């Protein structure tokens, strides 16, 4: 299977997001990379499901709460950006203050 760099990046995000999802399901608090991966993967999947950029920007703020992550992680993540593929092309999705 031949993948270009963008496809490899998306596969890595998905894999890391899956690990984070499983850890969260076991009740573990997510660290910085896990939290970013969890949010990023959910945004990519939302775009694939047909959500708009504005819907994803709101959706990204509902995924994790302070209780889901280790101390200090919410302050470390001012924003999450991911380039998602939509029916009309790729667009940058930015979620500001994703963990409240």
Curated annotation (Swiss-Prot):
One of its GO terms (molecular function) is nickel cation binding. GO terms for biological process: urea catabolic process. Heterotrimer of UreA (gamma), UreB (beta) and UreC (alpha) subunits. Three heterotrimers associate to form the active enzyme. It catalyses: urea + 2 H2O + H(+) = hydrogencarbonate + 2 NH4(+). Belongs to the urease gamma subunit family. Pathway: Nitrogen metabolism; urea degradation; CO(2) and NH(3) from urea (urease route): step 1/1. This is Urease subunit gamma. Its EC number is 3.5.1.5. The keyword Hydrolase applies. It holds the Pfam family Urease_gamma. It is an enzyme of class 3 (hydrolase). One of its GO terms (cellular component) is cytoplasm. The gene is ureA. Keywords: Cytoplasm, Hydrolase. The keyword Cytoplasm applies. It is found in: Cytoplasm. CDD domains: Urease_gamma.
